Amino acid sequence: MEGMITRRRFVQASSAAAALALAGTGGCGMKGSDRAVKIVVVGGGAAGLGVSARLVRLLKKAQITLIDPADRQFYQPGFTLIGSGVYRPDQVWRRQSACIPKGVKWVKQAVTALEPAKNTVTVAGGTVYPYDFLVLTPGIQCNWDAVEGLSQKTLGEGNVHSIYDFEGAQKTWRAVQAFVEKGGRGVFADTYTKHK
């Protein structure tokens, strides 16, 4: 299909932030290890996937567990392209299971407790995962309710839209199409400092 992002390209693009972060700290020159350690990575977004992929390549005997409840992995920069009609919604996501690096155990649960003194992570089902090293890449959650007059439920209804999430980007494109058809005056705003 023309315009589709391949799985390989998708994972490469969504892992760019993690790769840049590692490069900035000398990560590209890191040497591998034969130590048998347990590593838990909390968060399966671009950073969590990128770090997990890097660790599984460098640490041949490590047990790497990635914890994230999401079914889908989103290429979030693509949300702007959905909102402008360049991409279709199906072009910015993949099944999370297809993005987990080979050799990494995926736990599809939400984290409910971190106990650094005990080196453990507890998930929603009650299972406790011990670790030698913990990597936290949980991502963010937009707090729309902190903006007077907005809520996650009402955003995208009426004339206020955002491309900061998957559903919002689709609503934005529908609103742009309606605006082009009807005409009128459009007001676009951006925050002084990014909230994501």
List the predicted regions and their residue ranges:
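N-terminal secretory signal peptides and thylakoid transit peptides that target proteins
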Residues: M1-A18
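Glycine-rich, N-terminal phosphate-binding loop of Rossmann-like dinucleotide-binding domains
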Residues: S14, G125, P138-G139
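Active-site beta-alpha loop architecture of Rossmann-like, nucleotide-cofactor-dependent enzymes
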Residues: A17, Q141-C142
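Rossmann-like dinucleotide/flavin-binding elements
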Residues: G29-K61, A146, Q152-K196
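Conserved Rossmann-like nucleotide-cofactor binding loop
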Residues: A47, R72, Q141
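Short hydrophobic core segments
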Residues: P130-G139
